[in-house]
Swiss-Prot record:
It comes from Cupriavidus necator (strain ATCC 17699 / DSM 428 / KCTC 22496 / NCIMB 10442 / H16 / Stanier 337). One of its GO terms (biological process) is dTTP biosynthetic process. HAMAP family: Thymidylate_kinase (MF_00165). It catalyses: dTMP + ATP = dTDP + ADP. Its EC number is 2.7.4.9. This is Thymidylate kinase. InterPro entries: P-loop_NTPase, Thymidylate_kin-like_dom, Thymidylate_kinase. Keywords: ATP-binding, Kinase, Nucleotide biosynthesis, Nucleotide-binding, Transferase.
Length: 203
């Protein structure tokens, strides 16, 4: 039986990464699951991690950025995601294609139609079974990022960029309510995990 594919999404500072290992551990405790793989984008493979460093720290044209994102994703799918799903394992990815539509599409303004062509070519019919969108106002995200490590190229973007990115995430969630669950990530970790527990119990 094919495994399930779960993605975590949200703007920088939304707090999604705090919950990935917790959800993975909850799923590993279930007797009906063959195993759980946690991964991330960009990254997840040796080549993907090299591309991640370029994407996070090197200036480039916006179309180059999108193409590199999908190049890393193709490798990620071929080497990690698809094989794990075929073996019946569940895969949890910190970001996937929704992030590209939000950041490169919403944030950068790259045409959705171009991204859809790349999505179809790179992924075929592969889509997450569940996408958890951790949503916070920009003020909350900024407060959480303040004083953290030196910001990368994306974290250094303008407030307007992140507003467009957040708006695109929410637009995609509204378009695909059967796949998305929008999490109010301004709440306490305990409250968020109570909600996550209920969500993962249904899949």
């Amino acid at each position: 039986m094919r495994g399930k594919f779960i993605t975590f999404e949200g703007i920088d500072g939304a707090g999604k990464s705090t919950h990935i290992d917790w959800v993975a551990d909850r799923l590993r405790a279930r007797s009906d699951i063959a195993g759980v793989v946690t991964t991330r984008e960009p990254g997840g493979t040796s080549l993907g991690e090299d591309l991640r460093q370029i994407l996070l720290h090197r200036k480039m044209h916006l179309e180059t950025e999108a193409l590199l994102m999908f190049a890393a994703r193709r490798e990620h799918i071929a080497e990690v995601i698809a094989p794990a799903l075929e073996r019946g394992k569940w895969v949890i990815s910190d970001r996937f294609t929704d992030a590209t539509f939000a950041y490169q599409g919403g944030g950068r303004g790259l045409a959705t139609e171009r991204l859809e062509v790349l999505e179809d070519w790179v992924q075929g019919g592969l889509q997450p079974d569940l996408t958890l969108l951790f949503d916070v106002p920009l003020e909350t995200a900024s407060e959480r990022l303040a004083g953290a490590r030196a910001p990368d190229r994306f974290e250094s973007e303008s407030r307007a960029f992140f507003q467009r990115t957040r708006d695109e995430y929410l637009r995609r969630a509204a378009q695909s309510p059967q796949r998305f669950r929008v999490i109010d990530a301004t709440r306490s970790i305990a409250d968020i995990r109570d909600e996550l527990e209920k969500i993962i119990a249904t899949i």
